[in-house]
Curated annotation (Swiss-Prot):
One of its GO terms (molecular function) is ribosomal large subunit binding. Responsible for the release of ribosomes from messenger RNA at the termination of protein biosynthesis. May increase the efficiency of translation by recycling ribosomes from one round of translation to another. GO terms for cellular component: cytosol. Its main location: cytoplasm. Coiled coil: none annotated. InterPro entries: Ribosome_recyc_fac, Ribosome_recyc_fac_dom, RRF_sf. The keyword Cytoplasm applies. This is Ribosome-recycling factor. Pfam families: RRF. Keywords: Cytoplasm, Protein biosynthesis.
Length: 186
């Protein structure tokens, strides 16, 4: 393995950690409706549990309401029950074939609780990035130990790895700040 491969591997894995964090942020409810909120809700479809998006069209009616249109007539009640039974705290209402999912207003206490969750998730993402930095630096040191690179090259590689780390940690901080702002907006 060369220094270039170690750096590319580190950057790629750091990007994956940040992408995973972005994905986990979409599951945290803000005051606004987001169709991605229902991605974690599964419904019984002929004996197997599948995401709602595989049995219905999920879209926004307005800023505070998600609409779910089942593709099969008999799925409406099952989808409504699955949303109600999920831990999202949502109360769907069926109107013919359409299921409306209004987003309840969040209390100040719930908002503060969610910002703590967002910060904790952000901290986990930063720890993951730092662990990847450590692994990459160890890989570079191993190359130095095997005399495959010079000390100058090792130092340069560690500096570049640190720049990757700083960039991804700044991105995580930016995502956390944006999500907190979304949550605290009334």
């Amino acid at each position: 393995m060369s220094i270039v491969e170690v750096k590319q591997n580190a950057e790629q894995k750091m990007q994956q950690s940040v992408d995973s964090f972005k994905n986990s942020l979409t599951k945290i409810r803000t005051g606004r409706a987001n169709p991605g909120l229902l991605d974690t809700v599964h419904v019984d479809y002929y004996g197997s549990m599948v995401p709602i998006s595989q049995v219905a069209n999920v879209s926004l009616l307005d800023a505070r309401t998600i609409s779910v249109s089942p593709w099969e007539k008999g799925m409406g009640a099952k989808i409504e029950k699955a949303i109600r039974d999920s831990d999202l705290g949502l109360n769907p209402a069926a109107q013919g074939d359409l299921i409306r999912v209004p987003m309840p207003a969040m209390t100040e206490e719930r908002r503060k609780e969610l910002t703590k969750v967002v910060r904790a998730e952000g901290e986990h993402a930063k720890v993951a990035v730092r662990n990847l930095r450590r692994d990459a630096n160890e890989g570079v040191k191993k190359l130095l130990k095997e005399k495959l690179v010079s000390e100058d090259d090792e130092r340069r590689a560690q500096d570049e790895i640190q720049k990757f780390t700083d960039r991804f940690i700044a991105e995580v901080d930016k995502l956390v700040a944006g999500k907190e702002q979304d949550i605290m907006a009334v």
